[in-house]
């Protein structure tokens, strides 16, 4: 397990032998994504993965001869107003009404272990050797605001976790209108989107749809993640099955309003964004105040949906669940509702409790 920074090419490589995630500091100072998938052997440069080409009517970020367009480049945390017309990960409203922001690389830190996001729930480590973390500090000089992109790669799992933290320094207050937890991009659209939908008493039906140009999304505006959609989606290759093929899983560790969205542009590039739903979200930051997004847990599998599922099960049982009962057999709870509904009295309740078939330790 290691996080490697190549000074000459300004590239970051997160790898643990099971998965690789590679980023770069682009020539305009923003963070670009180069690769996410099966583990690659480290090398001095991954610039062959940087794809840039001229396209009709595109907005170019730098003077000629540059052909860098934010609309057609893979970005780590896209913002509004930089020439990218896809849905952004962040939108910040200033006092004058402007929603344009442009966060540029300032510095980075690599350290062993993983920070807590308390009071937000998040995955954790018990020893620093279990994981390594990269924090990339970005800054927008116009609104005088810092943004920290945080990535943790686990030693024993094909897992990378992500979250974002904002810290406002400017004199005038700003308003976060959109502050998602993660954005991941792919150079093609050859995926099926898998999610879990349903309703009360029939939750979690597996739904699959082939990606099309435009936006496909799941969400909740219930104030909770709800029984209708789990805050999870997977992108699988069309030939992936339970046991073979590539699958990318994305799970938001948050139980409130959420949005999980996949957008395909006109050149068949795919962008997955996930986080707190922007609808009805508006968070004001004054000087010295900060905002922490929830965590997204990303799982890569080259052995189909089953390995992705097993990875989430193992990780969440051991590194999300916590406390006394994590590794203990829990007491049996008998709830009379399914047995009696509203048709109950003292005699029926006592009969349930004393039944030989009931080996319960608690009764509700």
Residues covered by each model-derived region:
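Polysaccharide-binding surfaces and accessory modules of carbohydrate-active proteins
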Residues: 5, 10-13, 21, 31-263, ...
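Terminal connector regions
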Residues: 305-319
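Short, basic/aromatic beta-hairpin or loop at an interaction surface
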Residues: 262-272
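Single conserved hydrophobic/aromatic residue that forms the stacking wall/gate
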Residues: 353, 357-364
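Conserved, mostly hydrophobic/aromatic
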Residues: 18, 164, 288, 334
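Short Pro-Gly-centered flexible turn/kink motifs
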Residues: 103, 283-302
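Short acidic, Pro/Gly- and aromatic-enriched capping/linker segments at domain boundaries
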Residues: 1-12, 270-285
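An acidic-aromatic substrate-binding cleft motif
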Residues: 315-352
């Amino acid at each position: 397990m290691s996080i490697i920074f190549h000074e000459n090419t300004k590239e970051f490589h997160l790898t643990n032998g099971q998965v690789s995630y590679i980023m770069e500091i682009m020539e305009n100072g923003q963070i670009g994504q180069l690769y996410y998938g099966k583990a690659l052997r480290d090398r001095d440069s991954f610039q062959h993965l940087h794809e840039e080409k001229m396209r009709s009517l595109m907005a170019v970020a730098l003077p000629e001869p540059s052909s860098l367009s934010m609309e057609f480049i893979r970005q780590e945390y896209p913002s509004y107003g930089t020439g990218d017309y896809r849905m952004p990960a962040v939108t910040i409203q200033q006092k004058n009404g402007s929603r344009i922001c442009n966060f540029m690389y300032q510095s980075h830190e690599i350290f062993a272990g993983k920070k807590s996001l308390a009071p937000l729930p998040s995955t954790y480590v018990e020893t620093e050797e279990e994981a390594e973390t990269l924090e990339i500090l970005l800054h927008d000089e116009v609104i005088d605001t810092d943004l920290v992109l945080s990535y943790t790669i686990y030693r024993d799992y094909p897992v990378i976790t992500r979250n974002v933290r904002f810290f406002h320094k400017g004199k005038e207050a700003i308003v976060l209108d959109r502050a998602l937890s993660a954005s991941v991009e792919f150079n093609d659209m050859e995926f099926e989107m898998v999610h879990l939908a349903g309703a009360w008493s029939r939750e979690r039906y597996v739904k699959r749809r082939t990606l099309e140009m435009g936006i496909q999304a799941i969400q909740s505006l219930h104030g909770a993640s709800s029984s209708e959609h789990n805050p999870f989606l997977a992108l699988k290759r069309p030939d992936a099955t339970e046991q073979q093929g590539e699958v990318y899983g994305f799970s938001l560790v948050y139980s409130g309003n959420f949005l999980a969205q996949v957008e395909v542009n006109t050149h068949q590039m795919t962008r997955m964004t996930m986080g707190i739903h922007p609808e009805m979200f508006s968070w004001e930051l004054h000087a010295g105040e900060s905002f922490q997004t929830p965590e997204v847990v990303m799982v890569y599998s080259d052995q189909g949906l089953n390995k992705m599922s097993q990875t989430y099960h193992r990780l969440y049982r051991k590194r999300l669940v916590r406390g006394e009962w994590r590794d203990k057999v829990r007491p049996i709870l008998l709830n009379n509702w399914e047995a009696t509904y509203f048709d109950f009295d003292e005699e029926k309740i006592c009969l349930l409790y004393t039944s030989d078939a009931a080996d319960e330790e608690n009764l509700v």
